[in-house]
A protein has these predicted regions:
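An N-terminally biased module of ancient metal coordination in phosphate/nucleic-acid-related enzymes
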Residues: 1-103
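Extended substrate/RNA-proximal surfaces in nucleic-acid metabolism proteins
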Residues: 2, 72-157
Length: 157
C-alpha cells in the first residue's frame, strides 16, 4: 500500500448528547420523535455533505450517563450524514469528590464491536451501595435501585 498523500487529519466530536439523554435533556420539541428529527436535521445542517473541512466531522461519540441506549438508537435510525464514518458509544459518569465545586466527569469510549457485551463486561462490574444494599450499574439493577428509593415506581420501567 503506497500513499503519497501523507497524514490526513479528521475532526472527531467525542462528546455528543442526544434527545432523551439521562441528564439535562435540553432538546426542543413537543415529543421525543420531534426532538430526534430536529437533532438529526441540526447535525446534517451543520456538517453538510462533509466537503467543508471546517465543518466535516468523521467520528462522533454518542454520550449518555450510564447508558448506551441512545447510541443504539442512533445506529438503528441511520440518519447521520454519510460523511460521519464512525459512531462510538460514550458512557459518562460523575465521580466524587467534586473539584472546584464541580463534579468530575469520566468518559468511557467503547469499540462498537463490543456493544453486545458492555452490559455484562462493564455495567455489571460497577458496584455501589445504597442503604447497605449493593447495586450494579446494569439496567435492571438501576431499576431495582429506583424501586428501592421510591416503591411507587415499581412496575413503571
Amino acid at each position: 500500500m503506497e500513499s503519497t498523500k501523507g497524514s490526513e487529519w479528521r475532526r472527531w466530536e467525542l462528546h455528543i448528547h442526544t434527545p432523551d439523554t439521562q441528564k439535562n435533556d435540553n432538546f426542543t420539541g413537543s415529543s421525543s420523535e420531534e426532538k430526534w428529527e430536529k437533532y438529526y436535521q441540526d447535525i446534517s445542517t451543520y456538517i453538510g455533505s462533509g466537503d467543508d473541512p471546517l465543518k466535516a466531522v468523521a467520528v462522533i461519540a454518542i454520550t449518555d450517563y450510564l447508558s448506551i441506549d441512545n447510541y443504539k438508537k442512533v445506529i438503528a435510525d441511520n440518519k447521520l450524514p454519510t460523511s460521519v464514518k464512525l459512531v462510538l458509544p460514550n458512557v459518562e459518569m460523575r465521580i466524587q469528590p467534586i473539584a472546584n465545586d464541580s463534579p468530575i466527569n469520566i468518559h468511557f469510549v467503547f469499540n462498537p464491536d463490543i456493544i453486545s457485551s458492555i452490559e455484562s463486561r462493564f455495567f455489571l462490574k460497577i458496584n455501589f451501595r445504597y442503604n447497605s444494599t449493593t447495586f450494579s450499574a446494569s439496567h435492571s439493577e438501576l431499576i431495582r435501585l429506583g424501586n428501592t428509593i421510591d416503591s411507587s415506581l415499581e412496575g413503571l420501567a
